[in-house]
Amino acid sequence: MAVGLDRADKSNYALRLKEMFNKEIRLQCRETNISKMSSKFHDNLLTAMEKADWQQRELERIERQLVLNRQELEKRLLLEKELTRELEATKLQEATVREHNNELMECIHALKRATGTSINHDALPARVKGVTVLRNTDGDQWIPFDLAVTDTEGLNSLCQKLQSNNIDVNKWRQLVSLATEMSMKWNYSTPNRRDNAKVDIIEIDLTSPTNQIIL
């Protein structure tokens, strides 16, 4: 009877020992799984943090680029406004030049009709160049002229010559005044003559077939 109880105690002890051993194994497996899960969690966390850092740097880069783009856009808008102002100013200047040119051409045509004077348009406004015809009973005479608008002495001499032949010089003076104004306002340069010499008023007898004037 005592022997049977002893065997039963040993059997129970073995079972408890086995159960404890199995429980220890399960605990070790659980710890291993927890360790693996923890390691994976930390790896994922590190990856997420690195990705967050990259995204932050990328966001800062994009923000800097946006600031640069905004500054560039503002510069272009300012440049566009400046170009628009310059364009309007240029259009206004061109309109003023056209108006002056129209007035100048009107004077030229009126002068030609009133005095028989032809003007070289290409020489204006820096120079007053052309030829006038004096008609009288003794024969027609051509008076060519090529004067800078700043040559006051030459212009006065020509006006006196025209006036002495009973030619109205009002349109002539208006023409010279407009040419002088345009020359000063728009900074036209006065072409130099090849000989740099003062041009005298020359009378040419039209009755001679060999005399020709080319403007």
UniProtKB/Swiss-Prot annotation:
Signal peptide per UniProt: none
Domain of life, source organism: Eukaryota
Coiled-coil parts of chain: 43-114
GO biological process, any: meiotic metaphase chromosome alignment
Main location: nucleus
Cellular component terms (Gene Ontology): Ndc80 complex; nucleus
The entry's keywords: Cell cycle, Cell division, Centromere, Chromosome, Coiled coil, Kinetochore, Meiosis, Mitosis, Nucleus
Protein localization: Nucleus; Chromosome, Centromere, Kinetochore
Function recorded in the entry: Acts as a component of the essential kinetochore-associated Ndc80 complex, which is required for chromosome segregation and spindle checkpoint activity during meiosis and mitosis. Required for kinetochore integrity and the organization of stable microtubule binding sites in the outer plate of the kinetochore. Participates in SAC signaling that responds specifically to disruptions in spindle microtubule dynamics. The NDC80 complex synergistically enhances the affinity of the SKA1 complex for microtubules and may allow the NDC80 complex to track depolymerizing microtubules.
Family: Belongs to the SPC25 family.
Subunit structure: Component of the Ndc80 complex, which is composed of Ndc80, Nuf2 and Spc25.
UniProt-recorded name of the protein: Kinetochore protein Spc25
Organism (species): Drosophila ananassae (Fruit fly)
